[in-house]
């Protein structure tokens, strides 16, 4: 997925904040608030885990890709609701690029102390 599609989604999700919850699924989630959005992210995460297990057994990743797309989409809704965007995440990933996972975790632990 190119970053362009993420930026396009950011704009659309931001625009949905002013749309009617009766006509926009995303607007309805915003209206219901953080707990509803978190519930959807949790549901999508669970469905992603189940799809990954199924994919390992069936050797077919189609449903896994579908579920990860749902998870990403709902995570983008969460970010937008919190006043963040995909750019915040890609910037964080860029900061971590080139670090080993162990090094990144050690740096995180130092910052949390």
Swiss-Prot record:
Q: Which reaction does it catalyse?
A: 1-(5-phospho-beta-D-ribosyl)-ATP + H2O = 1-(5-phospho-beta-D-ribosyl)-5'-AMP + diphosphate + H(+)
Keyword annotations of the record: Amino-acid biosynthesis, ATP-binding, Cytoplasm, Histidine biosynthesis, Hydrolase, Nucleotide-binding
> Which EC number applies?
3.6.1.31
- Where is this chain primarily localised? cytoplasm
Gene Ontology cellular component annotations, sorted alphabetically:
cytoplasm
Q: Where in the cell is it found?
A: Cytoplasm
> What GO terms in the biological process aspect are recorded for it?
L-histidine biosynthetic process
This protein's pathway reads: Amino-acid biosynthesis; L-histidine biosynthesis; L-histidine from 5-phospho-alpha-D-ribose 1-diphosphate: step 2/9
Name the Gene Ontology molecular function terms of this record. ATP binding; phosphoribosyl-ATP diphosphatase activity
UniProt cross-references to InterPro entries, sorted A to Z: HisE (IPR008179), PRib-ATP_PPHydrolase-like (IPR021130)
* CDD domains from the UniProt entry: NTP-PPase_HisIE_like
Q: Name one Pfam family in it.
A: PRA-PH
UniProt-listed NCBIfam families:
histidine_hisI, PRK00400.1-3
Recorded family membership: Belongs to the PRA-PH family.
Name this protein carries in UniProt: Phosphoribosyl-ATP pyrophosphatase
Protein source organism:
Hydrogenovibrio crunogenus (strain DSM 25203 / XCL-2)
């Amino acid at each position: 997925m190119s970053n362009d599609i993420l930026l396009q989604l950011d704009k659309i999700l931001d625009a949905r904040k002013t749309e009617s919850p009766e006509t926009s699924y995303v607007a309805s989630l915003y209206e219901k608030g953080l707990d509803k959005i978190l519930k959807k992210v949790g549901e999508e995460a669970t469905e992603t885990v189940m799809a990954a297990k199924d994919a390992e057994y069936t050797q077919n990743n189609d449903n896994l890709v579908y579920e990860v797309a749902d998870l990403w989409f709902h995570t983008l809704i969460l970010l937008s609701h919190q006043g963040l965007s995909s750019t915040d995440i890609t910037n964080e990933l860029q900061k971590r690029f080139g670090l080993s996972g162990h090094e990144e975790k050690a740096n995180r632990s130092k910052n949390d102390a």
